[in-house]
UniProtKB/Swiss-Prot annotation:
Organism: Salmonella arizonae (strain ATCC BAA-731 / CDC346-86 / RSK2980)
GO molecular function ontology, one term from the record: rRNA (guanine-N2-)-methyltransferase activity
GO cellular component: cytoplasm
SUPFAM superfamilies: S-adenosyl-L-methionine-dependent methyltransferases
Protein name as catalogued: Ribosomal RNA small subunit methyltransferase J
The EC number(s) this enzyme carries: 2.1.1.242
Residues passing through the membrane, by range: none
HAMAP family assigned to the protein according to its UniProt record, in alphabetical order: 16SrRNA_methyltr_J
Keywords, ordered alphabetically: Cytoplasm, Methyltransferase, rRNA processing, S-adenosyl-L-methionine, Transferase
InterPro entries listed in its UniProt record: 16SrRNA_methylTrfase_J (IPR007536), SAM-dependent_MTases_sf (IPR029063)
Catalyzed reactions per annotation: guanosine(1516) in 16S rRNA + S-adenosyl-L-methionine = N(2)-methylguanosine(1516) in 16S rRNA + S-adenosyl-L-homocysteine + H(+)
Length: 249
């Protein structure tokens, strides 16, 4: 995949070349999207809109840390949707990992989560965030046990993941209407990089075959059900809907 690769660390240790080789990235000086190695982290920038800033995965600070410390935990909609109850903490495959936010919430309350991400740039961002999280004295011990990244296309990986998870979680890219600054910023950068998930409808059936208990699909409240298959079971929040489908025992 072609993208502008920039090293701002000043280390001169060839880390960017190693990164490019690992994720199959090719430097393109004229690409509007840039993957930038900074002294703190790896980040994605839209070069023609510098005011948007960089997008990176951060399990340690910012919104993620606040959500872990002060969020609803088991009371969060995503936790309810996957079926967390009492001692039951399902094994989850998050087949559309993105920046890993929902996967991290599930891991923080005790679920084991395998994240699938097919885009190599997004996978590199996730991997960088995980590496920093794993190294942290506070969250590292449990994060290493519960949150894992698999760089693969969900359309193929969903047919051969072992062991089978109890829950498959899907949050396909869908054009957002919200005007919040964060959503606008991230969606604009992400849409520029990966575009909408045009093949997302094809994920529902293999997800239902893989999950032993249920499939959870997160949708904006105005979006039609995935693959136009309606379900009476849903958890509705302000702005979103978690559609719940039966898996295959």
């Amino acid at each position: 995949m072609k993208i502008c690769l920039l090293d701002e660390t000043g280390a001169g240790d060839g880390a960017l070349s190693v990164l490019a080789a690992r994720w199959g990235l090719e430097h393109d000086e004229n690409n509007l999207m840039a993957l930038v190695l900074t002294p703190q982290h790896l980040e994605l920038r839209k070069r023609d809109e510098p005011k948007l800033g960089g997008i990176f995965v951060d399990f340690l600070g910012g919104a993620m840390a606040h959500r872990r410390k002060f969020g609803g935990g088991r009371g969060e909609a995503v936790a309810k949707a996957v079926g967390i109850k009492g001692d039951y903490l399902p094994d989850v495959v998050d087949a559309t990992a993105g920046l890993g936010r929902d996967a991290f919430v599930l891991a923080s309350v005790g679920c084991r989560v395998r994240m699938l991400e097919r885009n190599p740039v997004v996978a590199a961002l996730l991997d960088d965030g995980l590496a920093r999280g794993y190294a942290d004295a506070d969250i590292g011990p449990w994060l290493r046990q519960r949150l894992q990244l698999i760089h693969a296309s969900s359309l193929t990986a969903l047919t051969d993941i072992t062991p089978r998870p109890q829950v498959v979680y899907l949050d396909p890219m869908f054009p957002h209407r919200q005007k919040s600054a964060l959503v606008k910023k991230e969606m604009r950068v992400f849409q520029s990089l990966v575009g909408p998930d045009l093949d997302a409808d094809g994920l529902l059936e293999p997800a239902r075959q893989l999950a032993t208990k249920r499939v959870v699909v997160k949708r904006p409240d105005y979006a039609p059900p995935l693959a136009d298959i309606a379900t009476p079971n849903a958890i509705v929040t302000k702005g979103h809907r978690f559609d719940i489908y039966a898996g295959t025992a």
